Design a protein with these regions (language model features):
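Structural signature of the two symmetry-related core transmembrane helices
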Residues: 47-61
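Intracellular juxtamembrane helix-capping segments at the cytosolic ends
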Residues: 84-97
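Multi-pass alpha-helical transporter architecture, strongest
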Residues: 142-160
């Protein structure tokens, strides 16, 4: 989310407007964290993850293709997805691997998540500097989310 305000600046928003729109992300993160727990209690968690990824893909692609016209809804679905993904990590690790080695497995998975989260702004910025636009980075992010959704679709049912 480091680049969200610069993305909005690139599509013509003022700094003040871009920061206000980025604030929507914070609200959506909270809602994502709250609602994903409710959802996974009722719906198979990988399906919830796929739905959340699909929403985020739509938000990212809409931002890439339509720019300022969709900034607020894009901010919302991206923020919602960010909030949901963090909670899904712990839930899915517990459901698929149990609690016997939960700390070790969760720690490794979350470390990988954090490394990717830390590197992505650097890569996004480098691509922006090389191309002069965020479009390629947004399309690449959407492609990675499509791959993630396909992987979630392959997950087996939980053991009882």
């Amino acid at each position: 989310m480091v680049h969200f305000v610069p993305i909005l600046l690139d599509v013509g928003f003022t700094t003040d407007a871009a920061v206000k729109i980025a604030g929507v992300i914070g609200i959506a993160v909270i809602l994502g964290r709250l609602l994903v727990g409710f959802a996974v209690d009722r719906i198979f968690a990988p399906r919830v993850a796929i739905a959340i990824l699909f929403a985020c893909i739509c938000g990212v692609l809409a931002l890439a293709l339509l720019g300022s016209a969709v900034a607020v809804p894009a901010a919302f679905v991206i923020g919602f997805s960010v909030g949901a993904e963090v909670d899904l990590i712990g839930y899915l690790v517990a459901r698929y691997f149990g609690i016997h080695a939960y700390g070790q497995i969760y720690g490794r998975q979350y470390s990988t998540f954090l490394i990717a989260t830390g590197l992505s702004p650097v890569i996004l910025g480098a691509v922006r500097d090389a191309t002069g636009t965020y479009t390629a980075s947004l399309f690449t992010a959407a492609a990675f989310m499509i791959v993630s959704a396909a992987l979630f679709a392959k997950l087996p049912k939980f053991k009882q």
